[in-house]
Amino acid sequence: MKKSLILLAALAGALSAQALDVNNLKANDNGKFWSGRAAEGYGISIGTEPKVLYNTLKVSSADGALVIDTREFFKRPDARKIVTRFYIKNNIAALKGKETSAKVQIQAEEGSGAVNLYLEGNRGTEKKHYFTAQPFAVSGCSEIVHTKQLPEDVNDIAIRLDLNKPAVYRIFNAAISAK
């Protein structure tokens, strides 16, 4: 048990962001997405499918969380999903060929949330590669984790979180760790 707790603590701290103190949060009217930076130094982008509905999102930062209100977006008949990416600076060499976990602390309010969690990145000469997704139902505060063996030729990696139902989502933490 003690060994498991030590290993869990080491994994939680490895290559991770400890809080989501978001700044420079702004809408990009040309690219039709939201962007921001976490105090920990990684980038955040929030887009919609279709892109033209990005301005229906209410995006803010409050109490150590990124807050995304998707209720107006999902009232539109052509609304499909919100794609949120966390471009976490990490030592990619430490992840190559390793079992890697994406971990997100999230809460859904004013609705029952549904999300897909991905490890997303580039490998070899491919532009985008999705290292599988895992669906989660979210209510209250949850910690969701998706683990995948990364290939040896991975070039970069990000956490992708698709928001699939109307709710007010609060994202408290996003982290990547490897065994």
Task: State the predicted function of each range.
Residues 1-4:
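Positively charged n-region of N-terminal signal peptides that target proteins for export
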Residues 9-17:
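Hydrophobic h-region of N-terminal signal peptides that target proteins for export
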Residues 19-179:
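Extracellular and organelle-lumenal recognition/adhesion modules and their flexible linkers in secreted
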